[in-house]
Amino acid sequence: MLRRIAVIAASAVTLACGTLPASAAASPVHAFGIPGVYGVRAWGSYQHTGAKIRVTVCVKDAARDVYGAAAAGLAFDSGYRHHDDVSVTAIGDGHMQCRALVTRYLGHLVVEALSGYRNGKVRHHSTPEWIY
């Protein structure tokens, strides 16, 4: 009987020590859409991870007559003095790509999408959108 109580107590202590405090729980993933242009579908997400943020940007070339699609996200500090960027391209109808960035700049996130011609010139670009 004492052995059972000792095992139960040890199990309870192990479980209590193994759980994370509420402050260490992962924050939710926030999805966003990037304003599109003809033939381009773009989207992304961000998630706070402690003192940093993980930004993911995805793009899909969705039209046969669009040669390539691109999307970019810029994460700034609160004063717009420093930034990190993540960009992604997809070439060919139906192709999709995603890229991620972990940055310490938590102030603002701005995203934009564009489509391009075969010669590398920009065909159309969306209006930049402030996510936060």
Predicted regions and their residues:
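Post-signal peptide N-terminal regions of Sec-secreted extracellular proteins
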Residues: 25-132
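N-terminal prepro-regions of secreted/extracellular proteins
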Residues: 1-41
